Structure formats: C-alpha cells, structure tokens
Amino acid sequence: LDSGYAYKAYDTTEELTEMREFQQINKQPQGYFGGTWRYASSADREAAEASGRTPVVRLAIPHDRKLVINDAIRGRVEFDGDTSDDPVLIKADGMPTYHFAAMVDDHLMGTTHIIRGEEWISSAPKHVWLFEAFGWEAPMFVHVPVIKGKDGSKLSKRHGDTRCLDFRSAGYLPEALANFIALIGWSPGGDREIMSMDEMAEAFSLEGLQPSPGVFDADKLKWM
C-alpha cells in the first residue's frame, strides 16, 4: 500500500453493480479499472472510513504499459495493461483472495515453475505484477493446452468417462492410462509410444510440450 502498488477501494456492492451494468450497456471492457478510489485523496478515504465503509485492497495494475510473461511453451507473451483490471487482493472481511494467497505461497515455497491450464493465462499479468510489487523473482510460467475430444471441443463428460476411477473400473491398467495421458500434448521425440513410468520421467522435458490442444482418442487408449 505504501509503495502505491495497491490501494484501498471503498465501493459498495450497489456501486459495483451499477458500474458493471454501465459497462455492459455501453459495451465497455468488463472489470474494475481504478474506479473512484485508485486516485482518491486522503480526505475522501478518511470520509469513507468515517462513514463506516469497509474497504477491499486492490492491486494497482499499470494501465500505461505492457505486462510481459515468459512462458515455457509460448515464449514471450505481452498483455496491454489497459485491458487488465485491478483485482481484489484482500476482501472486506480481511481474507486474501486466490490471486494474492497463491502467489505469496508460491514465493514462500520456493516454487520455480507454475504449471497450469492455458485458461489461466489471462490471469498471468496480474500474477507477474504482484511478484514485481513485492520485489520477488517470478517463477517460470507453463500454460499447458487443454485436452479436446475428437470433435474438437473441450473434453467433458459428454465425451464419456473422464475420471481416473472410471477407467480403472473399466479395466484399464494404470500404466497404460498414464502412458496415454502423458503423450497428449507432449512428445518425447522419435516415434516411440509405449513407455514405462520411469522411461517417461527420464524423457520428459518442458521443451516437448506442444502449444496446440491435444486430442483424447479413446481408440488409441484401448490399443495401449
């Protein structure tokens, strides 16, 4: 807060609802981009406190520059700061949000790589800026592609079994399922497809991960 990387926002629920409705009606980007409180005076903040408003703490995303992440699969990825909203870090009840708690935990645990689904890449600018705000070195980000069905849509229950327990109940061997899943979106090089757990562990590298979605082919699993 003292360094200006974060600020207290005293918006009421009603005011936030009105803001979202205004953005929708006027086809504006959705989110909180500073609102009333990012540049509010000390007097306005004191008045809000005196009136009994309880603030949240928001991260002040720089809206005048690009935010950059280095992704092990996609390389350098740039985001326009003016399209990233200011996320809540501490809620009005004093509890931290995921964005705040997870990044602090990653730092304290000495995390070197954040490996997660590509649907999280839109949150990466917030996380990178949070690391910068604390003066911490950001881990390497690895946004792996989703797994799709043979029809090209994201894998879901309508494609059939998606839980490991379902495959075990159907008689599939754990080693075969692990081998099959490992090769969706990752290539060990060459044309070898049948590998033991130890062989896959030895061959695995982030460089072998593919940026495009993999396809869940049930027929190939049966073959394995």
Task: Cite the ranges covered by each PLM segment.
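Catalytic adenosine-cofactor/nucleotide-binding cores of aminoacyl-tRNA synthetases and other
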Residues: 122, 134-224
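Active-site cores that bind ATP or allylic diphosphates and position pyrophosphate for catalysis
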Residues: 2-143, 148-155, 163, 188
